[in-house]
């Protein structure tokens, strides 16, 4: 009966007709099998070089990850989180691409220009957050850091302040470098 119902070989035509006749007489209708639905798998990779920028901005980074998680749930995407240390990043990315997700969002706050070639190791679409990556086929989402700092300096100047200082990380962070450039440009 199973061979007939699943339209398999190994059953004579006469037996096949008799089985189908009984099936129709009894009004049997096979249950529709649910097809396994492939879910979109998204990975969030948090790139860590020195940890200072990530640690000092935990609330900001957590809010980004929370929102990504919320949207993945809303669209029934599977979300995979991965921490990636700069010194082992190449091996980590190569290993991840053995069973690649459908897309990757890189928290790139601590990515520096020498790290950019690592992004080419991804074999799936990539978006970098919190770093203005200028690299072929890599999109990024970042604040307008220079304009932001220029606006702050301009605002303080309009309030009457003439000696405006700037604090920045001792470790290199692209966002901070861009903000510093905006600060210096507005002071001129």
Model feature map: region roles:
Residues 40-154:
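Alpha-helical recognition/docking segments in bacterial nutrient-uptake
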């Amino acid at each position: 009966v199973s061979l007939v119902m699943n339209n398999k070989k190994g059953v004579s035509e006469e037996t096949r007709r008799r089985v189908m006749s009984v099936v129709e007489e009894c009004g049997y209708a096979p249950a529709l099998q649910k097809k396994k639905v492939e879910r979109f798998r998204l990975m969030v990779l948090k790139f860590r070089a020195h940890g200072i920028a990530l640690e000092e901005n935990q609330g900001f980074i957590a809010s980004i990850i929370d929102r990504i998680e919320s949207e993945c749930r809303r669209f029934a995407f599977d979300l995979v989180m991965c921490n990636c240390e700069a010194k082992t990043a190449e091996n980590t990315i190569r290993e991840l691409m053995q069973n690649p997700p459908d897309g990757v969002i890189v928290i790139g706050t601590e990515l520096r220009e020498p790290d950019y070639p690592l992004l080419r190791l991804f074999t799936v679409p990539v978006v970098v957050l919190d770093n203005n990556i200028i690299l072929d086929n890599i999109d990024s989402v970042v604040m307008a850091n220079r304009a932001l700092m220029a606006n702050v300096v301009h605002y303080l100047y309009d309030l009457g302040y003439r000696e405006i200082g700037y604090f920045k990380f001792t470790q290199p962070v692209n966002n901070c470098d861009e903000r510093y450039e905006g600060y210096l440009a507005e002071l001129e």
